């Protein structure tokens, strides 16, 4: 009789611990989901637009470009043949537009 009680107690203990951990995991998951939904509603559209904008994807200055495709360089840059240290390269590069 005593052995049966010990085994029953052990089974109940294991089930209690297992179910308790499952509840904690689901609570963390639901909290994470709520936080992600709140973040998406507050910042999601703005962040997605700003990350995907052409200016944010802009590689910047001294990046190879194709002179026949004006969209290779960002709006602040223009596709020019290199001068000075880069004259031996065959391709064009994005340089800052000259003011004036």
From Swiss-Prot:
Covalent S-S links between cysteines: 58-74, 65-79, 73-94
Gene Ontology CC terms, in alphabetical order: extracellular region
Propeptide span(s): 23-57
Keyword Magnesium part of the UniProt annotation: no
Secreted in keyword set: yes
Broad class of the protein's primary localization: secreted
Subcellular location per the Swiss-Prot or TrEMBL entry: Secreted
Transmembrane segments: none
Source organism superkingdom: Eukaryota
Miscellaneous remark of the record: Negative results: does not show activity on Nav1.1/SCN1A, Nav1.5/SCN5A, Nav1.7/SCN9A, Cav1.2/CACNA1C, and Cav2.2/CACNA1B.
Function statement: Inhibits 31.17% of Cav2.1/CACNA1A current at 1 uM concentration.
Family: Belongs to the neurotoxin 14 (magi-1) family. 08 (Ltx-4) subfamily.
UniProt comment concerning the protein's domains: The presence of a 'disulfide through disulfide knot' structurally defines this protein as a knottin.
Protein name: Omega toxin Ap2
Organism expressing this protein natively: Acanthoscurria paulensis (Brazilian giant black tarantula spider)
């Amino acid at each position: 009789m005593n052995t049966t009680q010990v085994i029953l107690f052990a089974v109940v203990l294991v089930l209690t611990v297992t179910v308790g951990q499952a509840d904690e995991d689901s609570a963390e998951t639901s909290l994470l989901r709520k936080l992600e939904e709140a973040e998406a509603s507050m910042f999601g559209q703005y962040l997605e637009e700003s990350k995907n904008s052409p200016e944010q994807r802009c590689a910047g200055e001294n990046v190879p470009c194709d002179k026949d495709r004006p969209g290779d360089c960002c709006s602040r840059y223009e596709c020019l043949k290199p001068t000075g240290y880069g004259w031996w390269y065959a391709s064009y590069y994005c340089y800052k537009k000259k003011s004036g």
